[in-house]
Amino acid sequence: MTFVVAAVVLLTVVPLATPLKCVQCDGPLTEFDCKTTVPEAKDCPQLNTHCFRNDTFNSKNELIMVRRGCTNEKEPSPPCQEVGNGGRRCTYTCNSDGCNNAPGFAIAIEPSRMVIFIVTFSVMISFILHTSAN
């Protein structure tokens, strides 16, 4: 039983070996406009732990360019910054496969990590209850 608990805890702590997959496109520099048409998510370089979406707005608050890709930054600070002539650039990050693919961006929780956490927590509670009963 101790081995099972140790194995589950180890799986929770050690990151999975598969690389993160993010949508990667650069607005007008690719065949996809990155706003409404995006390519399939691709593997990120090993050190990149998050996906990003970078939106650039003009002074009329119109979305003029979108970039999407991989990064090792969790959250930009601040998320939005002023850029020339009253425009702004906002960067959003997330950490699950393909989470930066939506036209409107939403932060996603990696489901596999949540399942591992729930299983680990359940096994630990069962172990504690079992040992305290004896």
UniProtKB/Swiss-Prot annotation:
UniProt main location, coarse:
secreted
The record describes its post-translational modification as: Contains 5 disulfide bonds.
Q: Which GO terms describe its molecular function?
A: toxin activity
Q: Could you name the domain of life of the organism this protein comes from?
A: Eukaryota
Q: Which GO terms describe its cellular component?
A: extracellular region
Q: Which UniProt keywords apply?
A: Disulfide bond, Secreted, Signal, Toxin
Expression across tissues is:
Expressed by the venom gland.
Localization annotation: Secreted
Leader sequence residues: 1-19
SUPFAM superfamilies in UniProt: Snake toxin-like
Give the protein family. Answer: Belongs to the scoloptoxin-05 family.
Relay the record's extra comment: The scoloptoxin-05 family has remarkable similarities with the three-finger toxin family commonly found in snakes.
Name the chain's protein. U-scoloptoxin(05)-Er2a
Which organism is the protein's source? Answer: Ethmostigmus rubripes
